[in-house]
Amino acid sequence: MHTITNETDVWAGNDWSLFSVRGGTLTIKNGTVKAKDNDCYACDVQYGGTLIIEDGTFVGNISAVYVHEGKAEIKGGTFSIVQTETEGDPYRFLLNCYDSNRQAGKASIVVTGGTFENFNPADNAAEGAGTNFVDEGYKAVKIAETPAPNGTFQVVKNAKVDNADELIGALADPEIANIEVASDIDLAAKSSEELTFEEHKTIDIKEGVTLQLGSANFLTAEKGLTLTGKGTLDNSAAASTAVVAAASDVHEHKSLIHVTGGDLLIDGVTLINDPEYHWHGSSYNTAAIAYWNDANVTIRNARVISGEFTLCGMGRNGANTATVTLIDSFFESTSSNLDNKQHWAYAMRLFGSEVLIENCEVKGIQGAVSIEENAKAEIRSGKFYTVNTSGQQDAFYALYVSSSAEVTITGGEFSAPNVRTGLQIEGTSAVVSGDNDTDGRAEV
């Protein structure tokens, strides 16, 4: 691929850009177009021309793409600017039209794809507050908080779904990256195979809306999942198999989300993984969220409740290299070793290379937080505690560190109701390090 750039200034008279489309149609499919710092735009359109950008990297000054008269169709690519505007939002003209021509219908920008640094193409101030360049059927999704101050936005194909079949179809369609769930959907009859998707998906569950799973199915993200909104993902209404399991040596797990690769971001959603179900399966642990390999996990502003694990790392002996970031969220497990005297769990079991917990509340009975498998963790703030089941003394530790994990505690409250004596490990009854395998370490 080629790079088009300039070492001397281009800007003069009507020469504004490295590519200037003055009538006719120009299609750019790849490569890099980088304007000299503090000089010109990357591309402009004049005299009724049409610019089609399918891919590539475009770096401009004030604007990456400017349309004076004509049309720009942006289907892909990455867009940024070096020189910024001096007043108002400094990045607001990254995409821009000549105002009077846009108002007269002579200048337009239509965005159906692409990645934009510090600029939301669906909501910006280029042509006044609330300017939207994104075409119908597409949506701008914030994919990163960096670079400052506005982060990075990506435009993806959007689908609004109202029933189970529409949702299954959207998960299977590789071109649909964003799915909006605006009404209750019952997925209990769908298989886990139908709920497995190979491309990264964003699922936005609107406030007051419930996405209902069954007793034996769950979402599987092979290349990541972003789950947003103020709605609920729930399987607790599904018929519990606890009675059947109690009479059998074969136990099934219940989960909401499995992530085997890519990044998992949960923001604002409530997850309820049957709080009355206390069995693990023969292949998988019961966990609201289970993650493998390098599936980095970020959970913020969320509520996660489960009958066993709320969050569970999978893959021992260094196989799990995830980073886990938990911020401003609530986690609760109702698991106790007295439930069935066979299966139990901490509120969360964290594997991976790095763990950060900040301003979270984690509540358990069997235990709150277990950090294992060589993880390097920092707990900055929050509340971590266990409670006894009514009439019992079954609560264990607020924090348990094992298997060579290292945890640094710089803030937070840790409490447990019972004094555990006879422990051949360091720590207190609330914060405990070490196990029967390899010692872990907690520093306060």
Specify the residue positions occupied by each region the protein language model found.
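Secondary-structure transition/turn motif
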Residues: 32, 154-160, 248, 383
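FAD-binding core/adjacent interface of flavoenzyme oxidoreductases
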Residues: 236
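Generic recognition of long tandem-repeat/solenoid scaffolds
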Residues: 4, 141, 150-158, 219, ...
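Extracellular/surface-exposed low-complexity segments
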Residues: 76-77, 81-84, 88-89, 96-170, ...
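Extracellular beta-strand/beta-solenoid scaffold signature
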Residues: 8-22, 35-46, 59-68, 85-102, ...
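Activation/maturation switch segments at domain boundaries
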Residues: 70, 169-170, 174
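Detector for repetitive beta-architecture
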Residues: 1, 23-25, 30-32, 48-50, ...
